[in-house]
Amino acid sequence: MLRLDMLRYRSGMEGAWGRVYGGRWKYDGNGIGTKENYWAGEAGYDRRYPNNWRAGISLDYRDGKGKYDFGGRGDSKLYALSLYGSKDLTRGAFVDMVVKGGYIKNKFTLYDRGRNQFTGSSTARGYSVAGRYGKRFGTGDFYWQPQIQFTWAHLEPDEYDVSNKSAVMTVKGQSFDSYVARAGIEAGRIGSFGDLYVRAGIAHEFGGRIKASYSAADGGTKETSYDLKDTWGELTVGGTYNLSPVSRIYIDVTRGFGGDWKREWQLNAGFRCEF
């Protein structure tokens, strides 16, 4: 929803934009420890439409380097296409929507407790739909804005091989559905030079069960299931700077708190040009 935050209460009929971002997420639960450092780039274009709508399209690429238990590592790449829109409901209220589709590839090397090495690669397609409602209050240059958001995400089932020097194992991952609800508040100051803001929120995962089966060449099978239900918080501090009446840059940093899964940090930097 970051793209839509930057659109709100800005002038201009049409605009092109781009951003780069990077960070690290971490998961430590169900006896599993993993983290990933990533960087990404995104670019898009949007314009105004009748009835107080603004909508656009964007392309996103992300490269990640993962670290797993016992020294394992992974190299992931994500490619995604997004359609987004925002409607001004007047009197400070708004609704945002984002639909995204793409796929992620991961090439990995794993180790067990005995330091046996296993290698493999996987590819999964995914989709997500997010909606948010909020309302801005305030007078003069200062404002505060409560908001609620719900996101559904889906990963399709995937099948791939994991091998070492002496054996091959087939992994069948079942489809995965995530249902995340967020509630938060943003406060800031709007000035002629740009904006300053701070955003705090709490999120809860209602779904997030991962299931997979493992089949060895000798006929042995095993199944695993992990419940990723969790609650965590996030804090963002950032601002924008107006380069001209039709162009601006922005930067912000986000930190996650609590929960087995969290975004330890993320740094965003980008620009927008209207014409």
Could you say what each language-model-derived stretch is?
Residues 1-147, 252-266, 270-273:
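Outer membrane beta-barrel translocator domains of Type V secretion systems
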Residues 13-17, 53-57, 156-158, 208-209, ...:
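Short hydrophobic/aromatic-rich motifs at helix boundaries and adjacent loops
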Residues 30-37, 69-71, 105-123, 154-177, ...:
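Solvent-exposed, glycine/polar-rich loop segments of beta-barrel outer-membrane systems
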Residues 82, 87, 167-275:
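Outer membrane beta-barrel transmembrane domains
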Residues 140-145, 155-159, 192-196:
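Short, structured loop/turn "capping" segments at alpha-beta junctions
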Residues 149-151:
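Generic multipass alpha-helical transmembrane bundles of integral membrane proteins
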